[in-house]
Each structure stands twice: as structure tokens, then as C-alpha cells.
């Protein structure tokens, strides 16, 4: 009887640990994404330029800050595919916000997943799970020269 109880407890422990949510962190190149056919297909048209924090840019006028927090279905996609797709959604939202304000760029972009800043002059941060992938970006709308 004791063996059965121990076996049942071990089985429950194994099931409960495998049921925990996956949250895999990826860093991916923003420039590679922006220059892809995927970006053009998603409507990233070049009318608004994107600059990660740390990239050199001459700002003529700052026009306010914004945060976008996008999620996408990650089922049946690789982590990288899901992250690229959701990053394009976040960039599209920033592009629309910039156009509405008369800005031609979004500068000082940082990843802002769960309100934690990640700064890189080359990469954005994405978190991929079993069901969802998410990208949060914070940036400043601007007119640049």
C-alpha cells in the first residue's frame, strides 16, 4: 500500500511540473526583421524609421512616448516565427502612432516585457510560451533629420 501511495505521489509531481507554463526569452535582430519581406507584407512601409536605444540618430523634435504590448498565438509556430510575427504587430502599432502624431521615427526603443526594460542597440526581446508569444516595446515618437 505504501508503494502505491509513493508511486501516485511521484506521478502527480511529474504531471504538475510538466504543466508549468513555458516562458522562453529570445533576443532577435530588429534590423533583420525590418529588412525582411515579412515586414513589407505586414505593412511596415518605411514611412517611419525605428531606432533602438543606443543607436545614433539626430532628433529634431520629440513628440511623446508610447508602449505597445502585443501577444500572438504561438501554437504550431517555432519560437522565432511567433516572435517575428508579434514583433511586426508591435512595430505596426508604433508606426500607426507615429503617423497619427506627424512623426517620422520612433527613437529610443527598448523592450518592455512585464515592465522590465531591456536595452540593446541591435536586438529586441520576445518571450515565447507553449500557447502565446509576446513583445512589448517602449519608444519615443520623433521627427528626425
Name each model-derived stretch:
Residues 14-18:
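N-terminal signal peptide c-region/cleavage motif recognized by signal peptidases
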Residues 64-117:
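Short, well-ordered alpha-helical segments
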Residues 2-8:
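Sec-dependent signal peptide recognition
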Residues 20-72:
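N-terminal secretory signal peptides
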Residues 58-59, 99-100, 129-132:
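Extracellular/periplasmic catalytic domains that process cell-envelope and extracellular macromolecules
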Residues 108-145:
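Surface-exposed short loop/turn segments
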Amino acid at each position: 500500500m505504501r508503494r502505491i501511495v509513493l508511486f501516485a505521489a511521484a506521478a502527480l509531481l511529474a504531471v504538475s511540473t510538466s504543466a508549468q507554463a513555458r516562458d522562453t526569452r529570445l533576443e532577435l535582430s530588429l534590423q533583420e526583421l525590418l529588412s525582411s519581406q515579412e515586414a513589407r507584407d505586414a505593412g511596415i512601409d518605411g514611412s517611419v524609421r525605428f531606432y533602438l536605444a543606443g543607436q545614433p540618430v539626430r532628433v529634431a523634435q520629440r513628440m511623446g512616448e508610447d508602449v505597445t504590448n502585443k501577444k500572438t498565438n504561438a501554437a504550431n509556430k517555432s519560437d522565432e516565427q511567433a516572435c517575428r510575427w508579434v514583433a511586426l504587430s508591435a512595430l505596426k502599432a508604433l508606426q500607426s502612432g507615429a503617423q497619427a502624431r506627424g512623426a517620422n521615427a520612433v527613437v529610443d526603443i527598448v523592450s518592455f516585457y512585464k515592465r522590465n526594460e531591456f536595452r540593446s542597440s541591435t536586438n529586441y526581446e520576445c518571450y515565447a510560451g507553449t500557447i502565446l508569444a509576446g513583445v512589448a516595446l517602449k519608444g519615443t515618437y520623433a521627427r528626425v533629420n
